């Protein structure tokens, strides 16, 4: 059963990758595919894929997803709280000692362009930390959440990760992939993923 779920999730990720490529054909940089994976990177990718699958299984526990009348509010609440929680965590990963041992692996890629593959190319400890943050957020907000908002939030996070690392210029009123691309280029800016309230507050927002 777990193997079947793993295959389904991987197919879903491939679908998200294709969506990210269809949304925009405008690349932000000509310097794409500037890094070749080593054995350590491949091990990290495999570990992260398995960890994400186990986390998703734990998150839903085979429950039936029912749409609540509070779905829009719950989803917006999740997106904002997740962004505000993840940004300082991401900022902490850029501390010189933590960065050298953990986060540097993700920033080997200065011009990400392979969507999910480049998004997941990170140290296992970084992945575990991010999943623990996600689990903590769901646990805290669980009394007011519905399964549909949790499921759609996971989908949007995965899609956002694919878009942010696609190398493609995608933007709307509240979201620009260029922000995360600039983070990979310059480092100490744009630690948020979507709304950048944290970055605007501490002065690290760059566009």
Regions flagged by a language model, labelled:
Residues 1-142, 191-207:
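Non-catalytic, topology-defining segments of multipass membrane proteins
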Residues 143-201:
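Functionally important transmembrane alpha-helices
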């Amino acid at each position: 059963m777990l193997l079947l779920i793993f295959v389904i999730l991987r197919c879903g990720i491939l679908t998200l990758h294709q969506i990210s490529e269809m949304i925009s054909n405008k690349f932000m940089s000509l310097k794409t595919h500037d890094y070749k994976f080593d054995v350590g990177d491949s091990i990290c990718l495999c570990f992260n894929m398995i960890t994400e699958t186990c986390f998703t299984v734990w998150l839903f526990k085979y429950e039936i997803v029912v749409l609540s009348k509070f779905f829009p509010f719950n989803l917006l609440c999740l997106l904002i709280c997740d962004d505000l929680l993840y940004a300082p965590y991401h900022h902490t990963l850029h501390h010189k000692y933590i960065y050298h041992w953990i986060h540097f692996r993700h920033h080997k890629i200065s011009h990400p362009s392979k969507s999910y593959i480049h998004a997941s190319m990170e140290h296992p400890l970084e992945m575990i930390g991010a999943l623990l943050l996600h689990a903590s957020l769901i646990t805290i907000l669980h009394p007011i959440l519905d399964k549909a908002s949790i499921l759609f939030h996971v989908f949007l996070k995965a899609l956002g990760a694919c878009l942010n690392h696609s190398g493609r210029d995608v933007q709307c009123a509240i979201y620009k992939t260029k922000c995360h691309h600039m983070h990979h280029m310059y480092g100490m800016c744009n630690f948020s993923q979507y709304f950048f309230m944290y970055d605007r507050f501490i002065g690290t927002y760059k566009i």
